[in-house]
């Protein structure tokens, strides 16, 4: 058994003041740093995903001549239209400055194809193209993932569901997640779906206890 901690999209644009701010998104950073510190002590790999859109990305409402938050279709797939966010090379796409970035051993960038969105760290939304994440995890013999980040109901959820489908033992550090919640219960629904599909929902206390067993 070899574990890794996957930090999902802990970027400025998803935190308060950002272009697509998640309520209390910055509160996840302290949880992430505690988890990172524990992983370093236990010799557990720390990796991260980074939303990394070109400026002409098709999911941006301004590029689709639509309104933010409306549901439409992008190249045959359902698409929520988003504000411009996490554009490559901008401050909004950078990781939150309080995050312990020096501990991150590898970063997978996603959402780079302008014609399709990519919530999951493993695939685009159509499951047409894989990112490098699965290959990297296999090359490093990682079989168990703990996932936290932003947002619970989108990029965390779809990363978790893909991880399970690909055969990884997957747990979600719930107190390290916050949701967009276009509908008030979206995050709770996402957590239920993840659990129903086989994810283990955990909190920091349980995570630290479990992590001590791998030392």
What is each of the regions a protein language model found here?
Residues 22-37:
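Short catalytic helix/loop segments, enriched in acidic residues and glycine
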Residues 8, 50, 174:
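Active-site flanking residues adjacent to catalytic metal/cofactor-binding acidic residues
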Residues 198-210:
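Short acidic-hydrophobic, aromatic-tinged amphipathic segments that line or gate anion-handling sites
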Residues 35-36, 156-167:
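Histidine-anchored nucleotide/phosphate-binding helix
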Residues 33-144:
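Active-site alpha/beta core segments
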Residues 18-25, 121-125:
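Short glycine-enriched, charge-decorated loop/helix-capping segments at active-site entrances
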Residues 146-149, 169-181:
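A short glycine-rich beta-strand->turn/loop micro-motif centered on a GG-aromatic cluster
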Residues 1-5:
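Extreme N-terminal starter segment of soluble prokaryotic enzymes
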